[in-house]
C-alpha cells in the first residue's frame, strides 16, 4: 500500500478556522501538485480528508485533476484532524481497505507527527510539511514503512 500524506494547500485567513477556503495561491498549488501526480502515473483508489474546508477543497481539487477512480470522492474523517490522537489515527489506518494508492489530506502538526510515527523516527526529527507538501510512503505486507517521495510546492516550481 502507498500512503500519500498531503498537507492542505494555502488558505485565506479567517475568524472561523474550520471554514477557511483555499486562497488563489492554494488553488494554484493544487493544480501544480495534481499535474505532478498525474505525470507520475499515480492513480488513487481511496482518499480521506479532514473535515476542515481547506482540506476538503484540497482533496477535491487534486482528485479532479490527477488520475483517480472516476467516481472517487474523498471521505471526510476526524481521524485526519489535529485533535485526533496518534493512537486513534494508527488504529484507523490499520482498518483501511487494502487500496494500492491512498490519499490522506490533513494538517500540521499532526501530519508530521504521524509521518514520524509511521517511519519509526523520533518526533524531534519531525518533517516539516509545507502547505501542499506531500510525503509518499510505502507499507509492505510486514508493516514496514519507507519514505518514497517528498514533494513541496517549491520543488514543483512554485515560489
Please give the residue ranges for each predicted region.
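Active-site-proximal alpha-helix that buttresses catalytic centers in soluble enzyme cores
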Residues: 2-84, 125, 129-132, 159
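Generic beta-sheet signal
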Residues: 3, 98-106
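Alpha-helix capping/helix-boundary segments
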Residues: 54, 110-111
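Glycine-rich phosphate-binding loop signature in dinucleotide/nucleotide-binding domains
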Residues: 40-42, 95-100
Amino acid at each position: 500500500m502507498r500512503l500519500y500524506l498531503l498537507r492542505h494547500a494555502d488558505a485565506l485567513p479567517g475568524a472561523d478556522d474550520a471554514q477557511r477556503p483555499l486562497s488563489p495561491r492554494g488553488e494554484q498549488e493544487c493544480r501544480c501538485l495534481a499535474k505532478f501526480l498525474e505525470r507520475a502515473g499515480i492513480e488513487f483508489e481511496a482518499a480521506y480528508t479532514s473535515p476542515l474546508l481547506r482540506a476538503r477543497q484540497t482533496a477535491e481539487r487534486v482528485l479532479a485533476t490527477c488520475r483517480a477512480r472516476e467516481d472517487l470522492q474523498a471521505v471526510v474523517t476526524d481521524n485526519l484532524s489535529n485533535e485526533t490522537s496518534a493512537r486513534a489515527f494508527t488504529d484507523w489506518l490499520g482498518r483501511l481497505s487494502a487500496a494500492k494508492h491512498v490519499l490522506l489530506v490533513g494538517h500540521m502538526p499532526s501530519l508530521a507527527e504521524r509521518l514520524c510515527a509511521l517511519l519509526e523516527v523520533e518526533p524531534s526529527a519531525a518533517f516539516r510539511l509545507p502547505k501542499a507538501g506531500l510525503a509518499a510512503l510505502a507499507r509492505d505486507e510486514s508493516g514496514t514503512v519507507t519514505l518514497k517521495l517528498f514533494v513541496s510546492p517549491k520543488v514543483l516550481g512554485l515560489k
